[in-house]
Regions:
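Noncatalytic, solvent-exposed loop/strand surfaces
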Residues: 1-241
């Protein structure tokens, strides 16, 4: 939640089964104003908003503890800590779990970076910078094959490919489109194309279609808000904005 509380409740009656505090248990700081590393003129942060994700017996949560608990893995039924890793402050982006270059991992976009953590033990596998003037990122990364695509209102939209190197992994940039600066809406991937909002111009954005392999704009359409939601249903797009 906004104040950094992760809770598990029984669905039938709402009984609280376990609860964790990001600040007390993992050393996270709550931000109600400008986040560390921001320009000081950006919109205020509103606490811890990145959603957790479950996988098998575990739940992964972007706790944002900058002293070894940026990302935490807990037992889903008990809330017991399995591992913690990383030193970055949290962002608003959702976590993604997938296999990249043969390694199952959790991809996390933090306040200043995008990182891959090995799912079984939290080992950091790779990292690329996603620095913004506001020290916050919102768009959830898109995993496809061994590639990860992400966007920011400062750096634009870019894609990396993960490959194994020695005992670890490296991230290689495939393309970057600096003109498509998606701020809030996560694009959807359908049949080799990314669909989402482009650069915001004060509550007025273009809806754009990008080639997933090259990052080139295929087409664009004006007249959308900065906060439109996009849902892909087969060959149909539902766009609210």
């Amino acid at each position: 939640g906004v104040k950094g509380v992760l809770a598990c409740m029984q669905l039938a009656d709402g009984k609280l089964l376990w609860i964790k505090s990001y600040s007390k248990d993992f050393g996270a700081k709550w931000f109600g104003g400008n986040a560390p590393g921001s320009s000081g003129t950006a919109a205020s942060r509103h606490g811890n908003n990145g959603p957790p994700v479950t996988d098998d017996k575990y739940i992964y949560a972007p706790a944002g503890g900058h002293e070894g608990a940026s990302l935490v893995c807990l037992e889903k039924r008990t809330g017991k800590l399995v591992w913690k890793s990383g030193n970055d402050y949290a962002a608003y982006a959702g976590l993604m779990i997938g296999e990249l270059a043969g390694v199952k991992q959790v991809v996390m976009v933090t306040a200043a970076n995008m990182k891959g953590y090995r799912a079984k033990d939290g080992r950091e596998l790779w990292s690329v910078p996603v620095k913004t003037g506001a020290a916050r990122n919102i768009v959830t990364p898109i995993l496809h094959g061994d590639t990860v695509t992400v966007a920011s209102h400062t750096v634009g939209t870019f894609q990396i490919r993960i490959r194994n190197s020695g005992t670890g992994q490296v991230a290689e940039e495939i393309w970057r489109n600096k003109n498509v600066k998606t701020n809030i809406t996560t694009p959807v991937l359908i049949k080799g194309h990314l669909y989402g909002l482009g650069t915001s111009r004060g509550r007025n954005s273009d809806f754009v279609c990008l080639n997933h392999q090259t990052g080139e704009v295929v087409w664009s359409q004006k007249g959308y808000d900065d906060y439109a939601s996009v849902i892909g249903m087969g060959n149909t797009l539902l766009v609210h904005g």
